Amino acid sequence: MNVLIIDSGVNGSTKETINFVQYEDNNDYLEHGTLIANIIRAINPDVNIYSAKVVDRGGSTVNDKLAQALLYALFNNIDIINVSLGLPSYSDTIQDIINKLAKRGVIIVAAAGNNTSVYPALYNNVISVGATDDNGNIEPYSAPADVYTYGTVTIDNTTYTGTSCSTAIITGILSRGGHN
């Protein structure tokens, strides 16, 4: 199963890394994309991880970079796209690319957002993921979503919280089961 992580990059082993951030190398300085990859790999060690770096070391990105990463997926045999990031504005171009990906059977899983709803989770043909606590109650910070799962994970004695973690869990589960 080929999973593309659109994020701040992925440190460590990937099938391919594509960098859409000008004047930066492929390193994940924020370690956010690396966290997402580690969560997915914990659920499915056999997954093929591809990385599209669209977030710079300052933590920002724009719709154009997201569109470029989605176009990469459209032409490169990607099965599932994980987008654990959010942008505030709608783009017709991105919705068009998402529709084309959906027609090809590519699943797009996106974080619903922490404290506010964000794109790409708000686009059509995207599975938005929210966060719950250990008892299955929706976390107060979680934006409304299509599906919910745990929003807290612990890796190497460090605890991480947010809809980004929830999104990686759903991506990991989907990557284990295949899809058609």
Regions found by a protein language model. Name each.
Residues 10-11, 87, 116:
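Short, glycine/acidic-enriched loop or turn micro-motifs at the edges of active sites
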Residues 33, 37, 67-70, 95-98, ...:
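Extracytoplasmic/secreted envelope proteins and their assembly/folding machinery
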